[in-house]
């Protein structure tokens, strides 16, 4: 399926993902993940982007974020990945691209955001890296469940009501919505109902065919 021009809308949550070049690992050790999040949080604040969920896997990253400007999302990942690539290549005495092209993203309506939050946080469980939902350090899941962590999250309650996060993570996922989320993120198209798609078309000036 062809990849559309990226659509970014200010004030709308987006699912964002990006892989290492040729699916190579982008993190070797905990220090690397610390450094990545240091850069990410610095530029998240600079470009005024809300952070709802995140997960760092060995060769890719996932986020649910909300930019305050159309340019803010691209700037956040441009500068985060530029600074992190410089750090990682210097450490490895390597050169070349660390990340695979541009990031993929999809604006989310409330139903798709509800699924995207746990889709992002449950990545390590699906990959078989952990056996308990609270056992992975490098995602927003642990902070949600324990209230402890240095990477501050924005409240999701403007869009979704989740009172018991652990119970929410254990709910059966809506596979149809997840399928849509994956497909629309890969092709940079919005994930939502007809009303939401029309809203994004109006905001972006783009037309989407499904």
Residue ranges and their predicted role:
Residues 60:
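Glycine/serine-rich anion-binding loops at beta->alpha junctions
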Residues 1-14, 18-53, 57, 66-210:
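Short Pro-Cys-Gly-centered "Cys-loop" motif that presents a nucleophilic cysteine in a tight turn
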């Amino acid at each position: 399926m062809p990849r559309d021009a990226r659509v970014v809308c200010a004030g709308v949550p987006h699912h964002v993902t990006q892989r290492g070049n040729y699916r190579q690992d982008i993190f070797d050790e905990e220090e690397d993940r610390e450094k990545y999040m240091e850069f990410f949080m610095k530029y998240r604040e600079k470009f005024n982007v809300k952070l709802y969920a995140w997960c760092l896997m060995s060769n890719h990253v996932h986020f649910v974020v909300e930019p305050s400007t159309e340019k803010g999302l691209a700037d956040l990942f441009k500068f985060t990945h530029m600074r992190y690539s410089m750090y990682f290549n210097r450490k490895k005495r390597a050169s070349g691209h660390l990340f695979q092209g541009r990031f993929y993203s999809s604006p989310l309506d409330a139903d798709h955001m509800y699924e995207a939050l746990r889709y992002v946080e449950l990545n390590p469980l699906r990959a078989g890296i952990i056996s308990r939902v609270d056992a992975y350090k490098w995602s927003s899941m642990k902070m949600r469940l324990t209230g402890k962590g240095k990477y501050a999250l924005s409240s999701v309650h403007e869009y979704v009501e989740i009172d018991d996060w652990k119970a929410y993570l254990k709910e059966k996922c809506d596979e149809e919505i997840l399928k849509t989320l994956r497909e629309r993120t890969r092709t940079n198209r919005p994930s939502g109902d007809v009303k939401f798609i029309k809203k994004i078309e109006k905001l972006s000036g783009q037309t989407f065919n499904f």
